[in-house]
Structures are given as C-alpha cells and as structure tokens.
C-alpha cells in the first residue's frame, strides 16, 4: 500500500535520526576519534545506496534507496556533534520527509494508470498528463537539492560541517551528490519523456492527487523562504 510507503519514508525512517540525536547527548564528543569509523561508515553507506539507485529499474525501490542514502548524510552530520551539523541533519530530515513522500505519491499515481513500476514501461506521460509531469519535475529538483530549496540549505550545512571536520570527505559528498542528480534526472526522463505506449487508455489526474502534491510541496517552499523556523 502506498500510504505505508509514504509514512515509512516521511516519518518512520526519520525516527532513527531522532534516536541518534538523543543518544549523542549521553555520549562523549568526537574529539576522542571514537566515532570516526561510524562517520566513514555512514558516508560510505550513503554512496553505496546512491550507486544502488543507479541500477534500479523499479520505481518504488529507487525512491526507497534514495531515502536511505539521504539518511546516511543525516547520521554522519549528527555524529560530528556540532550546531551546524545538527541543524543540517534536522533540516534534511524535514525536507526529505516531504520530498520522498511526494515521490512515493507520484509513483502510485503512475502505477494506478500503467499497473507497472518498471521505469521504461511508464514513459511518455508528458504528453498525456502535463500537470503530473510538472509535479514530477518539482519533486525531482527538490530531491537533487537545487537552490533555494530547503534540501539545498540542509545539504549545504551538512557539507560545511563535514568539510570543516575533515576536508577529504568532500570527495565522497561530491560523488554522492553527483550520483543523486544522475538518478533523479534518469527517473524523471524515464517516466515522463519518450514515446507514449500504444493502446494505453490513461485516465486523467484527479483533483485529490493535485491537492496531495500541493500539501507536500507548499510547506517545503514556504519553509525554504523562512528557514529560521527550523534551523
């Protein structure tokens, strides 16, 4: 069920980050280098999850692995225990909670009309459902974290924190962001562009689907204009 995927990506996955924040208050600071393996593991996990996204053909699997890769960045930022890292992690959890939930919602919208989640079989929707294509574009751009979205603010804070802690981490972060942009654009182009499948009677999008996307993306845009509400 799509509701389960949306709740899992938006709320339950972020509870792990909240748990790490609460645990860090009782543990020593990172000056002991005790957490170095955990930070490296979190960044490496984020990169591997991104690489896994590149080889996915299933739409829901791709979005799920994307959520996991972002949580790797969140975990690394929290473990460093700096104010900027904590702010960046909190902001990314909120921003990606909205974004991943919106992507799952769009994936279900596509699935209801094509009855498949394979990327190459869901092509050509930009001709049939132009408004849905607009939602796909906005959600993917937010997933890539383009400025001035909240996702960009959070990733900038996390990147600054990790670079200040160890400049070498910029290599893994840069690679991770590059792969994120690659699979997000691949997902958009695969599902929306290309020739429309023949003998495909597609029903139009409903008002409730547009309302649902508005409820996901409007809070993100509003918080992006006033990020001090959560930072």
Swiss-Prot record:
EC number: 7.1.1.2
A single cellular component GO annotation: mitochondrial membrane
Topology class, membrane: Multi-pass membrane protein
Compartment(s) where it occurs, according to its Swiss-Prot or TrEMBL record: Mitochondrion membrane
Catalytic activity, as annotated: a ubiquinone + NADH + 5 H(+)(in) = a ubiquinol + NAD(+) + 4 H(+)(out)
Record keywords, A-Z: Electron transport, Membrane, Mitochondrion, NAD, Respiratory chain, Translocase, Transmembrane, Transmembrane helix, Transport, Ubiquinone
Keyword check for Nucleotide-binding: no
GO molecular function: NADH dehydrogenase (ubiquinone) activity; ubiquinone binding
Any single Pfam family the record assigns to this protein: Proton_antipo_M
Family in the record: Belongs to the complex I subunit 4 family.
GO terms (BP aspect): ATP synthesis coupled electron transport; electron transport coupled proton transport
EC class (word): translocase
Claim: rRNA processing is one of the keywords in the record: no
Known function: Core subunit of the mitochondrial membrane respiratory chain NADH dehydrogenase (Complex I) that is believed to belong to the minimal assembly required for catalysis. Complex I functions in the transfer of electrons from NADH to the respiratory chain. The immediate electron acceptor for the enzyme is believed to be ubiquinone.
Ranges annotated as spanning the membrane: 1-21, 34-54, 62-84, 89-111, 128-148, 169-189
Protein name, UniProt field: NADH-ubiquinone oxidoreductase chain 4
Domain of life, source organism: Eukaryota
């Amino acid at each position: 069920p799509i509701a389960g995927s949306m709740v899992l990506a938006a709320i339950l996955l972020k509870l792990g980050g909240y748990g790490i924040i609460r645990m860090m208050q009782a543990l020593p600071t990172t000056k002991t280098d005790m957490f170095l393996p955990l930070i490296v593991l979190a960044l490496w996990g984020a990169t591997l999850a991104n690489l896994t996204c590149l080889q996915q053909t299933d739409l829901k699997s791709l979005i799920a692995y994307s959520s996991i890769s972002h949580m790797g960045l969140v975990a690394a930022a929290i473990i460093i225990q700096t104010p900027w890292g904590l702010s960046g992690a909190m902001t990314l959890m909120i921003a990606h909670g909205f974004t991943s939930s919106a992507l799952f919602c769009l994936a279900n919208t596509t699935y209801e009309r094509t009855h498949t989640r394979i990327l190459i079989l869901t092509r050509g929707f930009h001709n049939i459902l132009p408004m849905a294509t607009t939602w796909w574009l906005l959600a993917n751009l937010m997933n890539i974290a383009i400025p001035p979205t909240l996702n960009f603010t959070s990733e900038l804070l996390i990147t600054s924190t990790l670079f200040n802690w160890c400049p070498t981490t910029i290599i893994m972060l840069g690679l991770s962001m590059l792969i994120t942009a690659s699979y997000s654009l691949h997902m958009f182009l695969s599902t929306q562009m290309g020739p429309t499948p023949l003998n495909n009677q597609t029903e139009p999008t409903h008002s409730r689907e547009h309302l649902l996307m508005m409820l996901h993306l409007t809070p993100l845009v509003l918080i992006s204009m006033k990020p001090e509400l959560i930072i």
